[in-house]
């Protein structure tokens, strides 16, 4: 396998600020100071946006039973200081955006390949069987 990287460029002159090797196919979430992403092996990672240094890394899949850990995060979204991640095998994992620690896990049931969305204060998940789950 090949390792992928995340890069930061100076938009004024096009020079590379930093790069960090992270094996991830998910699109990161970027806020004022942080870059949040999930590695392909289930680690929730927070990178300092200015320096590129890893602030923390938490294996969120280890909260699942051993036989359910062989999955991947298929998408995630941030809302109210929380990260909501969906897994291919049908779990919703809620993490703190401050510490990365898992705060809640919910089994949805169906395969999930799309990222969750937030609208009007509610979280929505679309499964591969075209079922929509909504949470307040």
Q: What do these predicted regions represent?
A:
Residues 7, 45, 93-94, 133:
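WD40 beta-propeller blade core
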Residues 10-13, 48-51, 96-100, 136:
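Short loop/turn segments that connect beta-strands within beta-propeller blades
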Residues 77-97:
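C-terminal hydrophobic structural anchor segments
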């Amino acid at each position: 396998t090949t390792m992928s990287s995340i890069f930061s460029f100076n938009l004024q002159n096009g020079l590379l600020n930093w790069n960090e090797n992270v094996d991830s196919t998910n699109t990161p979430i970027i806020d004022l100071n942080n870059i949040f992403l999930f590695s392909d092996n289930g680690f929730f990672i927070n990178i300092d946006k200015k320096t590129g240094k890893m602030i923390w890394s938490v294996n969120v899949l280890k909260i699942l039973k051993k036989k359910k850990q062989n999955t991947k995060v298929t998408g995630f979204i941030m809302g109210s200081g929380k990260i909501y991640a969906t897994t291919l095998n049908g779990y919703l994992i809620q993490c703190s955006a401050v510490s990365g620690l898992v705060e809640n896990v919910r089994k949805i049931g169906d395969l999930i390949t799309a990222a969750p969305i937030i609208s009007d204060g509610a979280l929505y998940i679309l499964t591969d069987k075209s079922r929509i789950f909504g949470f307040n």
